[in-house]
Amino acid sequence: MTNYHFTGIKGSGMSALAQILHDLNENVQGSDIEETIFTQKPLERKGITLLPFSRDNIKNGQHVIVSAAYGETHEEIKRARELGLKVDVYPEFLGSFIKQFTSIAVSGSHGKTSTTGLLAHVLGSVEPTSYLIGDGTGKGAANSTYFVFEACEYRRHFLNYSPDYCVMTNIDFDHPDYFKSVEDVVSAFQTMAKQVNKAIIACGDDEHLQTLQANVPIVYYGLGDHNDFQAKSIKNTPEGTAFDAWVRGDLFGSFVIPGFGDHNVKNALSVIALCHYEGIGYEDIVEHLKTFAGVKRRFSEKRSGKQILIDDYAHHPTEIAATIEATKKKYHDREVTAIFQPHTFTRTKTFLNEFAEALSQADHVYLCDIFGSAREEQGSLSIEQLQALVDGAKLLTEAEIETLKGHGESVLLFMGAGDIQKYQKAYEALIESSS
């Protein structure tokens, strides 16, 4: 049994990995900032000790795993070096850890978390499966056949992995604080493709993924006729979305998923393709696709009086457009009111016009102040510059949250990767106190 200490345990990947090792009967503790973050709840439920950052947390006999957000200057890492302890950065540790399983990385600019969750759900219903999801959820199953994990392209972290399979959902220009252009992103995915050992499952509707070269088979999925796995006859139903899956021109079968929007159909199709490649039966895939309950902060819904409140992690124009589209398909008889908090000044500046175009698909738009990341506390851009590009957009603060009550039976769509949840919580508290 190993004694693990996680420096930065509340990060989504770190939290999930800590849960996995705990499930596998290792001793796990961790430290982080004292602010409450949604990823810590599952840690607390499992009885994993959470500490504030301190060099005193580091003891002899520990194996220290450090978040990629922290470097050698962190007080805990300095102490670990003084004691001569084994220290691994999260992506490096994960890259080594996955070698004991049939490993399946899920990568892509958008849709990673939802696809990882869906694939883990389907595989885990058929075979022992461990998984690490980007919403902070992790599970370690004894004697696992599969390990499904989210592999992020940021700073090329996913190049620490050489998985058996890699699902690639799409390539888009994001993380402009690191990537220079979409070509730079493509280059990272091309390098990743060369590291895959068995097969790549890639969205063939994405022009960038069509250019991939690899030493293993590439199985393409999507809505276009050129794909190996194609979705046809897509229809909205009371249960979600129904579609037929065709494999190289032959009907494989009909499926229903709880989600809405073409992006969710494609995510499901990638899971179907992977399962088909692994020899998992049609009936198992059908049964477990339709029972997927979703992942945290991805189209998470609740009712509040006559309104529908949705919390979503969307923080890139492509994701915002897809989330608004899915909302309109599911709630076609309601107005959609978007409440958006931009995440990082760099991303907001880079995609200012694209954000405006995506948000304009909503019936009403409210904008919250830009959330700066730990890497950039402030920037020269103001939220008013985005407001000027979106007709009728209004600014929103927590103190003015009561304004949302004026939207009757609207769907209130809270979107962002920062702390947009505090606005929704403030609104829910207001509704509860006035009921």
Curated annotation (Swiss-Prot):
Which terms does the UniProt entry file under GO BP?
Answer: cell division; cell wall organization; peptidoglycan biosynthetic process; regulation of cell shape
* Alphabetical list of Gene3D superfamilies matching this protein: Mur ligase, C-terminal domain, Mur-like, catalytic domain, NAD(P)-binding Rossmann-like Domain
Cell location: Cytoplasm
Any one GO MF term held by the record is: ATP binding
Q: Where does ATP bind?
A: 108-114
Q: What is its EC number?
A: 6.3.2.8
Pathway assigned in UniProt: Cell wall biogenesis; peptidoglycan biosynthesis
Q: Which family does it belong to?
A: Belongs to the MurCDEF family.
Question: What this chain does, per the record?
Answer: Cell wall formation.
Q: What is this protein called?
A: UDP-N-acetylmuramate--L-alanine ligase
Q: Which organism is it from?
A: Shouchella clausii (strain KSM-K16)
